[in-house]
């Protein structure tokens, strides 16, 4: 599968390199970084799969780092992408959600220890987080002090309890004074809306995250209000797939701590919580001027249901020939990057008493051609305590004698939410 693995910083520096099938020349990373720079110049994202005469370069970008897998022969691309994502998720659990170049450098030893356990000869081997945490202790001030004083390693010498059993993701003998389990339903909206407000394409990508603090070996059964609407469902290994196929019921023995229970897609969504009305046009002439009028607001049913639409940001990529702007906004703040000519309008929380708008003019460089097309607006937002698909958890039964405390939280946010002007 993987011949080599690299972690590359956002400036092109190689932070981590791991080789399983012979030492690979670093020039392959230079070739990859050239592709990244070329994609940035074109205003696009780097392709996840890059083919070269000798290798296949498969990558994911996360925050300020790139995870790059190099394969010498054809493999299933999704398998490699999923493995790279699993590596990144493991780093997040060990080092925190903000994975930067500094984070990787500070936890250099732990990164290599995790890679040694997670892959065997380039193939995924141990990827279950709870199992890894039993073998490699997460970094911390206390653990570092103990290791330096006693001279002991943070890697255990014996296999964790239950590692050779059928339920490898959960160790035996877990006890809590307070038994509780929480679920987060997080849904992202990916859609394209044309200039007339009609939906060109739309889908929801959702996931259910779980935080489990239950004693013993609990066997849980979960039911949903409308499980038939879920497409392309991907489960944690703890879920009994046959039970889902037959009854659309989730039956599982959960890992201890945090884990992703499942991910899914929902298609055919035709109503969104926010609307964008963009009007961007350019006049013909030697000194072309563009008129801008963009309105962002909440749909009426959201106001009635008292939903809170927060962290709203509208991004407008203007023409490279734009020289200056004369814009005003009644809510929030905005600014344009002089190099990329991308305007970012930070609205924040949409108020219920008035509608945010941005209007004014943009001027083009003298003698430049009028843009052939108007820009598409990318919108970001977050709605707490709301699942746009309508998915809810109807019931959760536990096989243990105790009665656990249960909680569910929903969040809807924008993924690739594009509105054409």
UniProtKB/Swiss-Prot annotation:
Keyword Protein biosynthesis set for record: no
Alphabetized, the UniProt keywords read: Endosome, Membrane, Protein transport, Transport
> Which family, according to UniProt?
Belongs to the adaptor complexes medium subunit family.
The record's statement on gene disruption is: Cells are viable but are unable to retrieve efficiently some proteins from early endocytic compartments.
Indicate what this protein is called per its UniProt record.
Answer: AP-3 complex subunit mu
Which cysteine pairs are joined by S-S bonds? Answer: none
Q: GO CC: one term?
A: SNARE complex
Q: Which Pfam families match?
A: Adap_comp_sub
Question: Mind telling me which Gene3D superfamilies this protein's record contains?
Answer: 3.30.450.60, Mu homology domain, subdomain B
Q: Does the keyword Membrane apply?
A: yes
The coiled-coil segments of this chain are none
Q: Give the location in the cell.
A: Endosome membrane
